[in-house]
């Protein structure tokens, strides 16, 4: 993918591009993330979604979709507020995202609308208290969760 093609995609989606020596980041608003991922995966060479990661960055949760091409990487990045952690699922267009989104839902509490695992546990045990905070959010006290699960 040329930098010109990526810049055109970013412009169309209301996003920005930050290019590094090996990794380029396409940052887009949350309501454009599906279109961005489909756009990236349909361009020549950017065919492989390797994973999706999430990070607690304070008031928001950042979601990064990692694509691979040879020795270069491209990330589609967006953010959702912790107060309303919902995002459209890419699984309707990129089925490879199904389990990655389900994992992020479990550990960071982001609901991916349209994901077949929405509301189901895939990593956390069934005994994990439904009223406990997601375990990878900043400020989550693992000792408190252990007590809630009656493990201490």
Question: Where on the chain are the PLM-derived regions?
Answer:
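Terminal low-complexity/charged segments
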Residues: 1-152
């Amino acid at each position: 993918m040329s930098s010109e093609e990526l810049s055109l995609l970013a412009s169309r989606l209301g996003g920005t591009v930050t290019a590094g020596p090996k990794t380029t980041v396409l940052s887009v608003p949350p309501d454009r993330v599906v279109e961005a991922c489909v756009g990236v995966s349909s361009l020549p060479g950017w065919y492989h979604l390797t994973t999706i990661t999430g990070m607690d960055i304070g008031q928001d949760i950042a979601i990064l979709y990692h694509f691979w091409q040879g020795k270069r990487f491209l990330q589609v990045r967006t953010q959702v507020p912790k107060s309303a952690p919902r995002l459209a699922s890419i699984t309707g267009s990129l089925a490879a995202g199904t389990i990655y989104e389900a994992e992020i839902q479990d550990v960071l509490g982001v609901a991916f609308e349209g994901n077949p695992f929405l509301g189901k546990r895939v990593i956390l045990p069934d005994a994990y208290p439904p009223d406990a905070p997601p375990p990878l959010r900043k400020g989550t006290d693992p000792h408190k969760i252990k007590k809630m699960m009656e493990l201490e």
